[in-house]
Design a protein with these regions (language model features):
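Non-catalytic terminal extensions that flank enzyme cores
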Residues: 1-79, 231-282, 288-294, 306-374
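N-terminal catalytic cores of NTP/NDP-binding nucleotidyl/phosphoryl-transfer enzymes
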Residues: 43-116, 217-221
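Divalent metal-coordination and catalytic microenvironments
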Residues: 86, 139, 222, 256, ...
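Short, solvent-exposed loop/turn segments at secondary-structure boundaries
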Residues: 86-89, 121-125
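Short helix-capping/linker segments at secondary-structure and domain boundaries
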Residues: 104, 204-215, 315-324
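Short connector loops at secondary-structure junctions
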Residues: 108-123, 250-252
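Divalent-metal (Mg2+/Mn2+/Ca2+)-assisted nucleotide/phosphate chemistry catalytic cores
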Residues: 119, 125-243
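Small-residue-rich helix-loop
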Residues: 300-304
Length: 374
């Protein structure tokens, strides 16, 4: 029997049953109705949605209809900066950038250095803040412009957030956050208060613009508890409910459900060099057979293979991805060749990303929200 999985904003353990998790959280499945509505307004559908990486939501259809009525809205997501960024972290950001390109709305990006400081007993606050600046380079490298991307580093840009967070905190009882997040008597009060800050950004565009400006939040599904609470209290505070679009976790190279920062070989980082990327892909778990002869005779299993999973992420051509799938199943494609194909795709992506990342190094403060409000 499979180990019972655990998913919280701070821990993912076991093999995740995504349908069961969606039902536990009370989110809705992303259906063809919502996808068609997106296509109506965006003109196309991103591969991350077509291929099922994003699979659940809250009010995604409602915010698209809001857009159709010509009303203002914004995008919001974030990152807990505890180390370098890996490709799994970037999946919601890639969709975020695509949505920005299609709709041209403002983007709010929260770097939760305070949360990571509270959560990790070994983390120094200065270290978390340093990682916030480093991780911001990966966001900027995707091509956002300073007038539209508003970076919020919690310990540096708290001023516009705190009045909203105070109102949020007054609405949330200890019993509510304890039940939602699993807090215990040993949880420090920083972590207990922190949800107020993550929720506050969902209401920030409305405060800044002085009119209802709901947000759409593309993020991994482990973040749902925050935004479930945000939706529960929004109307009582005079704010529109945030909408969410939830992704699955990106399979680890080792075959587990989610990449792990504690195991560097489970993920490809945006700062990895080509030699490291090649080694990680060469050593990746696959759905292949023990020998080439068996693979040719029996075929492989791409459904459990992180290498195929990454092809789905990095190849925009549906026909190409389908060919890899069927070639693996039939035994025509061996794992070594498949890994080499993947290496070329990822090498190209990371090389371009690293170049853009370095160009952003002296520009972070120009994107910070507080520098625009001062």
């Amino acid at each position: 029997m499979d180990e019972e999985f655990v998913v919280t904003p701070w821990e993912v353990r076991g093999r995740v049953d995504y349908q069961k998790l969606m039902q536990q959280f009370g989110a809705r499945p992303l259906t063809q109705a919502e996808v068609s509505l997106l296509e109506k307004y965006a003109g196309e559908v991103h591969p991350l949605i077509r291929r099922g990486f994003f699979y659940a939501h809250r009010d995604f259809d409602a915010i698209l209809k809001w857009h159709g009525e010509g009303k203002p809205w914004a995008l919001y997501t974030g990152r807990g900066p505890s180390g370098p960024v890996h490709i799994g972290h970037m999946v919601p950001w890639i969709l975020l950038k695509w949505l920005f390109n299609k709709f041209g709305v403002e983007v709010y990006f929260q770097m939760t250095d305070d949360e990571k400081f509270y959560d990790d007993p070994e983390m120094r606050l200065e270290e978390a803040t340093k990682w916030a600046y480093e991780n911001a380079l990966d966001v900027i490298a995707l091509g956002f412009t300073p007038d539209k991307l508003h970076l919020i580093i919690d310990t540096k840009d708290i001023k516009p957030l705190y009045p909203i967070a105070a109102k949020v905190a007054k609405k949330l009882t200890w019993n509510t956050v304890k039940a939602t997040f699993g807090f215990t008597d040993s949880t420090n009060i920083g972590l207990i208060f922190y949800p107020s800050l993550q929720i506050a950004v969902a209401f920030l565009p409305t405060e800044l613009h002085g009119r209802p400006t709901p947000v759409l939040i593309p993020c991994a599904i482990d973040q749902d508890p925050y935004f479930r609470l945000a939706r529960d209290i929004a109307e009582s505070l005079g704010y529109p409910k945030p909408a969410t679009l939830y992704s699955k976790f990106i399979m680890a190279l080792t075959g587990e459900s989610k990449m792990s920062a504690s195991n560097p070989n489970s993920a490809i980082y945006t700062i990895d060099d080509e030699k490291t990327i090649r080694r990680k892909i060469a050593n990746a778990y696959t759905g292949g057979r023990p020998t080439a002869e068996e693979q040719r005779r029996l075929g492989g299993n791409p459904d459990v293979c992180p290498v195929y999973h990454y092809h789905m992420l990095f190849d925009p051509d549906d026909a190409s991805v389908e060919k890899i799938y069927h070639s693996c199943k039939s035994g025509a494609l061996l794992c070594g060749e498949c890994k080499q194909m993947l290496y070329e795709k990822i090498r190209k992506f990371v090389k371009q990303h690293q170049e853009a990342r370095e160009k952003a190094r002296d520009k972070v403060d120009a994107y910070r929200l507080s520098s625009k409000l001062s």
